[in-house]
From Swiss-Prot:
The lineage of its organism: Bacteria, Pseudomonadati, Pseudomonadota, Gammaproteobacteria, Enterobacterales. Keywords: Conjugation, Mobility protein, Plasmid. Belongs to the MobA/MobL family. It comes from Salmonella typhimurium. This protein is probably required for relaxation complex formation. Disulfide bonds: none annotated. Residues 1-46, 150-172, 196-221, 263-291, 328-371 are annotated as: Disordered. The keyword Cell membrane does not apply. This is 43 kDa relaxation protein. Residues 22-42, 196-215, 330-365 have a biased composition (Basic and acidic residues). InterPro entries: MobA_MobL.
Amino acid sequence: MASYHLSVKTGGKGSASPHADYIAREGKYAREKDSDLEHKESGNMPAWAAHKPSEFWKAADTSERANGCTYREIEIALPRELKPEQRLELVRDFVQQEIGDRHAYQFAIHNPKAAIAGGEQPHAHIMFSERINDGIHRDPEQYFKRANTKEPDAVAQKRHVSGKHRPNAKNTLLPRGRRWADLQNKHLERYQHADRVDSRSLKAQGIDREPERHLGAGQVQRFDTEQLQAILERREAERQVQQSRDERDSVIDVTTSLREALSERDTLTLKQELKSEPEQESHSGRTFDFEKEPDKLNALVSDAMKDIQEEIDLQSLVNDAMAEFQGIHQEMERQRERERLAEKQRQQEKERQRLAEQIRQKPDKGWSFSR
């Protein structure tokens, strides 16, 4: 099931190069076996780092101001439903949408196995520099110096100030989150997946449950069997509740066809009434000699048979509509019972989860992918 996650982080002087190695699985993070790296690439780099983006981040650590931001990172969860090449297409579209050709960037797609359920956890790390790319060639030292608006050729690019730890952080992050959700939904629709994501909080979506904390591999290893089972049962209960909602919605969709049937019945009735009026007018005050005008008799018989058939069809339509309505009512009753049982199971699991939380030694603070 597709899930929404977007967060923004910043890095200070000395942290860009190690973090770039981490997301690219290079340096001390390089692993020969069982790598979770699905893809990595970079763009908008100056000529001296075009083929080796690690040089760019090293220069940022060396030459950026002491209190400067060496990089900004957007971290996003990717839908499991999409294939690797489709996820890459999604990330590239997002990078083009949010960064374009304005900033040097590097991104990596990771796909580790979930610590509890063992499923895929595809996500992307997108690092970019706040320095705006103005097309002027500068060496590494000049690139990260304070911009000179009077002589832009002399020293570094201007910095784009936005996001976390800035006065307009909320105004930047929330619209970006909505854009990411919209783009992700477009790609899910493009590849014919029914799931959709929502950037709003669970409360804003009208979902009555607590958000689940992200659990790192180290924390999961400290859980006992009962704690792990409680988490899995909670997830299963939530899955059943969502399935019940989806099935209920599909039943509601069926009522649309019922309304259409009733509308069609009313239309047929109206047509019949309109048709009978001119016939009554034409037949009133006039008689036919059917022996001399057999065609008139045949026409009247044919019209009468059509009226009878329309009545039969109309009654059949009404009967079908009533049967469909009864089926809808019965199905909705079954859905209510399934939801009641699923809610009961969810409450039981929630209580077990609360007890498990009390004995947890080191609760996780915030969301962060561990791999």
